[in-house]
Amino acid sequence: MVEDSRVRDALKGGDQKALPASLVPQAPPVLTSKDKITKRMIVVLAMASLETHKISSNGPGGDKYVLLNCDDHQGLLKKMGRDISEARPDITHQCLLTLLDSPINKAGKLQVYIQTSRGILIEVNPTVRIPRTFKRFSGLMVQLLHKLSIRSVNSEEKLLKVIKNPITDHLPTKCRKVTLSFDAPVIRVQDYIEKLDDDESICVFVGAMARGKDNFADEYVDEKVGLSNYPLSASVACSKFCHGAEDAWNIL
């Protein structure tokens, strides 16, 4: 707390003096799937509606694709015989903003993956800045799905990348895997996480779809849990798990 107050005092009033190295906030190491030991929380956004569709060919810039969504492509979805609930990439967008903005992510204790409804697995770098507007997010996802990775402008670091299935190959060696179900016993997240072993991580599969069965992760999970006596959106479910882990691990 003393160091925090000295940092604030140094910055107050536009002080341009360089801070001592010991006072400069240090970014935590970036977690990757290669790290099989560090205790953390992993969130897998399962059944995510991220699907592109070609809308023009042989244009000046080549073929043009869009990210299917229920607001802009109702007519197209109808022609394809698809329900509009199958085109909800906005759910994934909301979840990513919630997760990546969280203190647990800034503390370096969160990893995020996306499993699309088409079986594509995506690793999300904790430092990536997801666009706030859905239009820009859509453009980014189209680029990712066709180029298979998005690199940082300032380095060769990959911020988003398509990786090989199955998801279990990328999880820590000791990891409790759970998924959310409205029919499962309701838990208090903080209490649940505090009961994990000292070296045990937790992986939560969250359904990033408008509706559907909760069997999307049955082949992976150890247990199904409930978070509330009321139906929750995917974004709120992500938020509750983040807050619970932050409280359990004393992340402020």
From Swiss-Prot:
Effect caused by changing R88A: Loss of substrate rRNA binding
Phenotype when changing L232S: Almost complete loss of SAM binding. No effect on growth and ribosome biogenesis
Record keyword S-adenosyl-L-methionine present: yes
Outcome of gene disruption: Depletion of EMG1 affects growth and leads to strong ribosome biogenesis defects, with defects in 20S pre-rRNA and mature 18S rRNA species.
Keywords: Methyltransferase, Nucleus, Ribonucleoprotein, Ribosome biogenesis, RNA-binding, rRNA processing, rRNA-binding, S-adenosyl-L-methionine, Transferase
Localization per record: Nucleus, Nucleolus
Catalysed reaction, written as an equation: pseudouridine(1191) in yeast 18S rRNA + S-adenosyl-L-methionine = N(1)-methylpseudouridine(1191) in yeast 18S rRNA + S-adenosyl-L-homocysteine + H(+)
Database matches in SUPFAM superfamilies: alpha/beta knot
Residues annotated as site: Stabilizes Arg-88: D90
Effect of R132A: Loss of substrate rRNA binding
Positions contributing to S-adenosyl-L-methionine binding: L180, G207, G212, K213, D214, L227, S228, N229, Y230, P231, L232
Gene Ontology molecular function, alphabetical: identical protein binding; rRNA (pseudouridine) methyltransferase activity; rRNA binding
Entries under InterPro entries matching the protein: Alpha/beta_knot_MTases, Rbsml_bgen_MeTrfase_EMG1/NEP1, tRNA_m1G_MTases_N
CDD domains xrefs: Nep1-like
Annotated EC: 2.1.1.260
Site positions (Interaction with substrate rRNA): R88, R129, R132, R136
GO CC annotations on file: 90S preribosome; cytoplasm; nuclear microtubule; nuclear periphery; nucleolus; nucleoplasm; nucleus; small-subunit processome
UniProt-listed Gene3D superfamilies: 3.40.1280.10
Principal subcellular localisation of the protein: nucleus
GO biological process: endonucleolytic cleavage in 5'-ETS of tricistronic rRNA transcript (SSU-rRNA, 5.8S rRNA, LSU-rRNA); endonucleolytic cleavage in ITS1 to separate SSU-rRNA from 5.8S rRNA and LSU-rRNA from tricistronic rRNA transcript (SSU-rRNA, 5.8S rRNA, LSU-rRNA); endonucleolytic cleavage to generate mature 5'-end of SSU-rRNA from (SSU-rRNA, 5.8S rRNA, LSU-rRNA); maturation of SSU-rRNA; ribosomal small subunit biogenesis; rRNA base methylation; rRNA methylation; rRNA processing
Impact upon substituting D90G: Loses its exclusive nucleolar localization and mislocalizes to the cytoplasm
Family membership noted in the UniProt record: Belongs to the class IV-like SAM-binding methyltransferase superfamily. RNA methyltransferase NEP1 family.
Subunit structure: Homodimer. Interacts with snoRNA U3. Interacts with NOP14 and MPP10. Component of the ribosomal small subunit (SSU) processome composed of at least 40 protein subunits and snoRNA U3.
Primary role: S-adenosyl-L-methionine-dependent pseudouridine N(1)-methyltransferase that methylates pseudouridine at position 1189 (Psi1189) in 18S rRNA. Involved the biosynthesis of the hypermodified N1-methyl-N3-(3-amino-3-carboxypropyl) pseudouridine (m1acp3-Psi) conserved in eukaryotic 18S rRNA. N1-methylation is independent on acp-modification at the N3-position of U1191. Also has an essential role in 40S ribosomal subunit biogenesis independent on its methyltransferase activity, facilitating the incorporation of ribosomal protein S19 (RPS19A/RPS19B) during the formation of pre-ribosomes.
Stated name of the protein: Ribosomal RNA small subunit methyltransferase NEP1
Provenance organism: Saccharomyces cerevisiae (strain ATCC 204508 / S288c) (Baker's yeast)
Chain's gene name: EMG1
